[in-house]
Amino acid sequence: MPGWISGASQLYEQLRNSVPWLEHDRRMFNQVFREPRMTAVYKHVADVPDARLLQAVCALSRHYGVEYDGLWMNLYRNGQDSTGWHRDHGSCRKLDCIVPVLTLGTIRRFLIKPIKGGRSMTFKPSSGDLVVMGGRAQQDWVHCVPKEPEIEGTRISVNFMSSAQGVRD
């Protein structure tokens, strides 16, 4: 949904400068790797860092009939930060889920492809756009934000979580 939230530039600056972003290590292939992005988790909507996000939670909950009760945010510092192909297991444990993602900041490619193989599709959401992965998207598709070394700007993704749809760690 293009231009879903107004004041995207101000919200981006507020989140970039006030959220306690963290780096995490991940064990894969018997090695430990630093995740190429930073994250912040708000398990309770009462704790979200900006009132506009609370308004977004309420609007999305009303619109989709899903109680969104937390946020998972990613900060991609530049084009070297990325996330590989994955499904959102933690926020979608049911067959049909609705996972909205608000994009803020620099435009980055967002790719999806069928889990059983096939060509990927590329989207380039702008700051303030809402990407909604609904239905069986988390069962039948994988998605990623690939590295783009030429990108210098920062991107934030705000993932709206629902404990009714998934189990949080």
Please provide the spans of the model-predicted regions.
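Non-heme Fe(II) oxygenase metal-center motifs and adjacent flexible, charged/small-residue loops
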Residues: 1-169
